[in-house]
């Protein structure tokens, strides 16, 4: 790559560790990683794009539920949707994630996979984040640079998200240069239907397995990729098992934990996940004890988001 690698990263331990690891992994000496083993996995929410004030997919869901309520009186009577309409997303989420997820599944049941894909892409391209930024400008510029750097060294990067796999696949290529086939996430059950000579996949009102958080991330990496990655990046307790799975490989493997400690440019919050054990040891403590590379958004990045188009 021309110019200074990782240009939005400050000189410091995190940048030096990443570049030093890559030099060893792609050089001829100890620590060399063969081409076939150059696999990296990245969490998405809070690792590749912002998850503040809430998850991007939750904002998409809220918009689509409001639209559905206008044409479906039965759906509009649901207490969770009533909370959304009168008190916003926070009020709806107060009913619990299971209740909100069930409402979403019900509202989107019967939609074809292709229609969902087109809807997600349209929303992403035309809607605005609560910050006022277009959604493509809510990704983290330094992480885009890391993905580009890995690509230039023949690494294949996968997204391993707790979010909906179809939602992230809708935008993974234009945002990150990661093809839809290389996205692993929480899945909805699908059925095949035939209409007018066409075979279509249709969404059902049920998840296909547990949410892709915690231990399922490691399991689904093995199922989807078939080998242990050599790089992992995350930011929350929901990523702990994925990071541990990668760290349990060769001693040279690289584990990265992003900490959100920048109130001026993004937010300050810990790595707790709403879907994992609240009594578990914090992932930041695990990272420091295990010798993983901890990235400070405030100290290690000169720029957080890409320049937003006018």
Kindly give the residue locations of the regions a language model identified.
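Charged, low-complexity surface segments at secondary-structure and domain boundaries
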Residues: 1-8, 47, 89, 100-106
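N-terminal carbohydrate-binding/catalytic regions of secreted carbohydrate-active enzymes
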Residues: 21-26, 31, 35-38, 52
